[in-house]
Amino acid sequence: MRADESGPERESREPTHIPGAEPELGGEPTPRGEPGPGFEPGPGGEPAPSRAPFRSRLRKGVLAAVALGGVLGGSARYALGLTFPTPRGTFPVTTFAVNVSGAFLLALLLVYVLEIWPPTRYVRPFAAVGFLGSFTTFSTWMVDTDRLLGHGHYAVAAFNVFGSLFAGLAATGLGLAIGRMALARRVRLAARHGRARRYGWWVR
């Protein structure tokens, strides 16, 4: 053995590799047999079961809720269109009413879901994304506007565009106002009965 390959100098040049003890970025290697950072033991010190199956089931449940809400919302709008058809060349009252009422209901629902009701997994995907998302329609609104322009009803087409926008904004504001009034009332009742809680982000 050569002199330059023995002693502490050799150990400093060639550190012993321990399988399973690779260092993490910016940290020291974890000795083999010891839990690494972020390890959460389960009962009895055993590794906790993976949450991947639960997340997979939750994702499927959310998708199913969105799909079911979409079927019901689209069917409701289609039924309203058949019940209250719009004659060609006239103002599309049904589409206008559907979009404005949908804006109001969505604003009211989100206040209840985010500020009042306890946390849920499926109400928002089902009602907001699924039902109201398919109940309201941007494409039919634009198609109706194009048909009005095609028949030369320019004033009616302009009212359909701008009237829907402003009415939708007003309906959204009304839904938020009603929802927040209900939220403030619940806060007052809870405080009156000695059950004061912190409801919402704006009532503190």
Swiss-Prot record:
It is a multi-pass membrane protein. Residues 1-16 have a biased composition (Basic and acidic residues). Na(+) is not transported, but it plays an essential structural role and its presence is essential for fluoride channel function. One of its GO terms (cellular component) is plasma membrane. Pfam families: CRCB. It is found in: Cell membrane. InterPro entries: FluC. It comes from the Bacteria. The chain crosses the membrane at residues 62-82, 96-116, 125-145, 158-178. Residues 1-53 are annotated as: Disordered. One of its GO terms (molecular function) is metal ion binding. Keywords: Cell membrane, Ion channel, Ion transport, Membrane, Metal-binding, Sodium, Transmembrane, Transmembrane helix, Transport. Na(+) binds at residues 133, 136. The keyword Electron transport does not apply. GO terms for biological process: cellular detoxification of fluoride. Residues 32-46 have a biased composition (Pro residues). It catalyses: fluoride(in) = fluoride(out). Belongs to the fluoride channel Fluc/FEX (TC 1.A.43) family. Fluoride-specific ion channel. Important for reducing fluoride concentration in the cell, thus reducing its toxicity. This is Fluoride-specific ion channel FluC 3. It comes from Streptomyces avermitilis (strain ATCC 31267 / DSM 46492 / JCM 5070 / NBRC 14893 / NCIMB 12804 / NRRL 8165 / MA-4680). The gene is fluC3.
